[in-house]
A protein has these predicted regions:
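SAM-dependent Rossmann-like transferase core, predominantly class I methyltransferases
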Residues: 55-146
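N-terminal auxiliary segments of SAM/dcSAM-dependent transferases
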Residues: 1-74
Length: 149
């Protein structure tokens, strides 16, 4: 089978199980299984797959079919302008949380130097994103669990 065929088959399975974005998830999971960027996958959809790669991909699809969040399967979540490592011990950054960053950036001028504290940092997405945008400021992130940091 080639990439296009396994993506279509997997997307059908995900769609039947009411997974949002079944094609996108299938492409991302095949990219993970093959250890290539999604862009490279999309330019090589006719590439024949090895049996071991199909087996690895099917295991990922099965996890997704069971409603495991795609971010946990991939091991990261895109947030603001970066990717953040996530697993079952860390809450997945939500897209609407990016509004917090937008509001903070309105308050803190680029030229200013602030000390920012992030309590209950989890993945660290908020503090890291803010400090990357306001590089003259300093951030401290704390969490009860060392697993999160």
């Amino acid at each position: 089978m080639n990439c296009s065929e396994v993506i279509s088959n997997a997307a059908y399975i995900l769609k039947e199980n009411l997974i949002k974005n079944p094609y996108l998830d299938s492409e991302m999971l095949l990219s993970k299984a093959l250890k290539i960027k999604r862009e490279n996958l999309l330019t090589n959809l006719n590439m024949k797959l090895k049996n071991k790669d199909i087996i690895k991909f099917n295991k990922l699809i099965e996890r997704r079919r069971k409603k495991e969040p795609i971010a946990y399967i991939l091991g990261y979540k895109s947030f603001w302008k970066s990717n953040f490592k996530v697993n079952q011990d860390v809450l997945i950054p939500r897209p609407e949380t990016e509004h917090v960053i937008e509001e903070v950036l309105k308050i803190i001028p680029k030229s200013a130097s602030y000390n920012i504290l992030d309590v209950g940092t989890g993945s660290g997405c908020l503090i890291v994103s803010i400090i990357l945008e306001r590089q003259r400021s300093h951030g401290t992130a704390i969490d009860l669990s060392l697993i999160h940091i």
